[in-house]
Amino acid sequence: MVNEEKYTYGINHEDIKTDDNSVIVLCEDEKEAGIINDRKEKGLIGVCKYQPAYQLLGSITRQIPDRTQRVEDITRYIGVYGFNSTLRVTLAMVIAAAYSKKGRTLFINLDEFSGIEHIMMSDGCSNLSDVFYMFKQAGEHFTQQIRECIKANELFDYIPAVVCADDISYVNDRLISGLLDELAHNLKYDYIVVNISEGINKPWSIMGRCSNVYISDSGDYIENCRFNNLKRYFIESGKEAIVDRMMRINLKMKDTMDEGFLKRIMYTDAYGYVSSLLDMV
């Protein structure tokens, strides 16, 4: 964002281009802004600077969609949440496998104690703890080092879970959202499936970013009450949109869980059931 005089006389235009090749010029009046906009030069937007802040921001956002909207046009975030962590991570793996048949999928596990390190193998050198550290060190930007932390199985890509619970409990929701956006923007996944732990700060902030939120359901009475409390919180705090995107799933898991689970996941009753539900979404 630059003022009109500096844009016209004082700078090399290439030096101020942003990642999406856009420049906002603050003009003295609407006439000058109109002249700039009439050129229809890609990435160049003129706005009058003499207006209330909320109107100024509105003028900009109407013409340049924000980064989150652009990313989500390409990548859909799929959230998995629940009050039984074992059921939740199982459902998350099944969801990731099902979405992998729809497009390129990345699985991110935000559990403090994942329990699936032998199912989704790591090379022992890099995991989500390292990714958070690299992301912060790089000023919250994607790097080649982060790319090298991503592993793959026959179905989807994944980042091995943290090895230290503090690496999840201390990270804030803004950092997680920023990491998701950078992964989506740079790697162009169709879907990023996120196992949303209760251990992270403000899990509903991550849910709010998701196109769909699947809730694991064991059928337990207290768990059902907790789910109702969660819905009430969303409604009373103005987050009804999250409720509209939520779906509870009771896997009624009959399949054996062991190190070879992912190799046979497509032949399990759980996968068949979830796939049939996704076909209706």
Language-model features and meaning:
Residues S177-T268:
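Conserved catalytic-core segment of NTP-binding enzymes
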Residues Y7, D20-S22, K42-G43, K102-G103, ...:
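Short, well-ordered alpha-helix to beta-strand connector turns
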Residues A138-A152, P160-I196:
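Cytosolic-facing regulatory segments adjacent to core modules
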Residues L262-V281:
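NTP-binding/hydrolysis catalytic cores, primarily Walker-type P-loop NTPases
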